[in-house]
Amino acid sequence: MVIALIVIIIFLVCLDVIKPRGYPPGPVWLPVVGSYLWFRREKSRVGYYHLVWSSLSSRYGPVTGMRLGTDYIVVACGYDAIRDILLRDEFDGRPDGYFFRLRTFGKRMGVVFTDGPVWQEQRRFCMQHLRKLGLGSRSMEAHIEEEARDLVASLHRRSNGGLTAIPMHDVFDICVLNSLWAMLAGHRFDLDDQRLVDLLDIVHKCFRMIDPSGGLLNQMPPLRFIAPRHSGYTNLMTHLNRIWNFLRETIDDHRKSFNADNMRDLIDLFLREMETSKCQNNSSFEDLQLVSLCLDLFMAGSETTSNTLGFAVLYMLLYPQVQRRVQDELDRCVGTDRQPTLQDRRSLRYLEAVLMEIQRHATIAPSGIPHKALKNTVLMGHTIPKGTTVLVSMWSLHRDVQHWGDPEVFRPERFISGNGNIKQDDWFMPFGIGKRRCIGETLAKASLFLFFSTLLHNFSILPSSESPLPSLEGYDGVTLSPKPFSAKLIPRK
């Protein structure tokens, strides 16, 4: 009996380390944990998740495979593999697992980490009604312009004529959120609203806690019972509860003042849709879905744009000659008696190229959002089993030496053609491509342009004498975020 048990255990152990036939090459699998020990060692060595993917690619090629805990993980680097994934329907899924369900009450809800009919219905609802509420319209632009003016006024007060250094790494958080929140909840927040400052700090912490592949909670879910603190479960639940409570309060306020004849925002429209679809068995419009949708938009809608703008200020500190050239262009094309508008975008070509180069060089979402294989398929000659989590290294795309020549160099001119126009590049994908392309791209582009141009139109950004020049090395996580830094803002007029 004992011998039989030992034989069975040995058989199961051997079975556990056998890779699927044709699976992409990668590090050795161990029983139970798969490649996890190698993954953690490599992460400790290189410091960032996206550099782990680059390390894998340099050893095994553009498509590499691991198993982390129970999860199959495939990482794609380089243009051909990434484009193939983003444009093929069989890779349009999102990972399913304990972590991905934890944030949405144990179910597959929201719009970011769903697929199939639920995702199609919710994405269609969001796009249709956000457009009606102003996405991509003059009213959206007016909202952002108002936020930019308020930010400038706040910075004038806080900077004391340029004498006082201001923390700049998170200065855009609330004004960026306000541009979205006006459409989502019909409300804007004061820039000094301490509750929002604290909540957005929690959002930043959540993004830094999360591993792009899903992390320990997804790969080894029992760890939440064995080591709740070490696995991140305790902190994550604390943060999520704070955000859930805020979103529920917002939705409850809408319910109390709901008027079916006066649709104020996306939450109202969702509540109306819930009423009209009550009798439909397969409708995805329910209470928890509304909270989950708000969670997705609240977190993803502010994080990447705010981080990009934080890095933009950092680049202007480190490259003062670029800052001066942007300001010269603003003075020449906009003048001093008005603020920049989106209509100025065509004439502010160097500024536009600077924003593109910031997005390329910083690559705020270096691993994108994870995809999932919806069926057994093949990628560049390798077998990808159904259910495999697929990560695309946008960092490898934006830092490819053969394509960019000098990818480590910050050089906005690479996006300007010989005749002075903006040069589009297929390798530049800050918002992705395909069906899973970022739904907030229009708002994000407008926000980046208007906040960045308005800031440099009104201030010169100088380093603080009290602290050394900051580094471009940011915090790791699902997104990269700038580490705390301050700058002096000198009024230009």
Curated annotation (Swiss-Prot):
Its cofactor is heme. It catalyses: methyl (2E,6E)-farnesoate + reduced [NADPH--hemoprotein reductase] + O2 = juvenile hormone III + oxidized [NADPH--hemoprotein reductase] + H2O + H(+). Its EC number is 1.14.14.127. Inhibited by substituted imidazole inhibitors TH27, KK96 and KK71. Heme binds at residue 438. Residues 1-20 form the signal peptide. GO terms for molecular function: heme binding; iron ion binding; methyl farnesoate epoxidase activity; oxidoreductase activity, acting on paired donors, with incorporation or reduction of molecular oxygen, NAD(P)H as one donor, and incorporation of one atom of oxygen; steroid hydroxylase activity. The keyword Heme applies. It is an enzyme of class 1 (oxidoreductase). Glycans are attached at residues 282, 458. One of its GO terms (cellular component) is cytoplasm. SUPFAM superfamilies: Cytochrome P450. It comes from the Eukaryota. Keywords: Glycoprotein, Heme, Iron, Metal-binding, Monooxygenase, Oxidoreductase, Signal. The keyword Zinc-finger does not apply. PROSITE patterns: CYTOCHROME_P450. GO terms for biological process: juvenile hormone biosynthetic process; organic acid metabolic process; xenobiotic metabolic process. The enzyme is present in all insects, except in lepidoptera (moths and butterflies), and is specific for methyl farnesoate. Lepidoptera contain the farnesoate epoxidase, which is specific for farnesoate. Catalyzes the conversion of methyl farnesoate to juvenile hormone III acid (methyl (2E,6E)-(10R)-10,11-epoxy-3,7,11-trimethyl-2,6-dodecadienoate) in juvenile hormone biosynthesis. Belongs to the cytochrome P450 family. PANTHER family: CYTOCHROME P450 15A1 (PTHR24300:SF376), CYTOCHROME P450 508A4-RELATED (PTHR24300). This is Methyl farnesoate epoxidase. It comes from Diploptera punctata. The lineage of its organism: Eukaryota, Metazoa, Ecdysozoa, Arthropoda, Hexapoda.
